[in-house]
């Protein structure tokens, strides 16, 4: 009975499931029934809008990416199925239905022990933690190790939500919100490491250009819509399209630049009253401690700098795929949401697209290399879910290329010791620096409050 109920809820998808969770959560916080319904509906509408814009990108840029690969005769055999392909496979895994209550219990335990301020209401994105557990289960054959993977991943991302809370608030202007999920959060530590290194390099540390700088310098020709149009022209030309195809693609990428920030607005309209109510109720009950509502990283995609970086990294990621030694993955399914990978980097670099380019190249290189290493397990996951054609192989950049997932696999089932040492050293250094950076911000805020 429990499994049937959970399966039905999961099949509703995030555009229905998240509003339901939000309505229930809002009611628990003491909001009026009408306000709860309105907030949940606005959030659902916003995510439908995001889905439509992402669908537009996937339908237009996806074929262009494949055409680019064929045009340049790229020898990449395994197609990235992206999160739209990976998430259903994950929910069909043996540990999926148990992973949801486990991840929720981890969150509750961390809140009660004051180890996190993040109150996660984004149940759908627990699939990221579940993916880690599912691959660990396949790699080791141990159900308990798979569950341990869910627990470790969950605890880690809730802390990431805490550590990047200042960036979420100050750069993205999301008051009372945390973004603990997906590539945006777990790629953030790499950006922190890159930013610290750049700060130490004389001359390079002074280079700065942002979406706002481009707009100021070029006027109407530097506006986001125009930048989107130009990026569409470049992608279309690289894909070998004719004039008609190039222009059609350019208008669609321009539309993405205009529409993405606008479809975020209904979500913010729904979240604002909930965040205020949550802060006041939870702080009153738990002695003034500030709490954050954990939500989907899609909220970050509406920022102009993130959209600009996304369009830059669509063709750039295909180039990176060619250059990464041993890579077998052709970027495809996740290209439309490439902004997830660099969104937190944009905030860490304070909108500096030069630094975002550097950290983004490193992030995507690591992602593709890890995605290649997990092809075997990912293919097995797809086969178990009945989502694999005979003789086929699958990969994904989102989660399939996750450092936390791959490092845990190597801990419990070592296969590539040199890679484990190198990736582990880079990632753990980034995590340490992220923790230290967050502590520094807290100390600064305490000094300001004291003054």
Curated annotation (Swiss-Prot):
Occurrences of domain PTS EIIC type-2 (ranges): 6-435
Annotated GO CC locations: plasma membrane; transmembrane transporter complex
Pfam families named in the record: EIIC-GAT
Induction remark: Constitutively expressed.
Domain text: The EIIC domain forms the PTS system translocation channel and contains the specific substrate-binding site.
PANTHER family assigned: PTS SYSTEM GALACTITOL-SPECIFIC EIIC COMPONENT
Name this protein carries in UniProt: PTS system galactitol-specific EIIC component
This protein's encoding gene: gatC
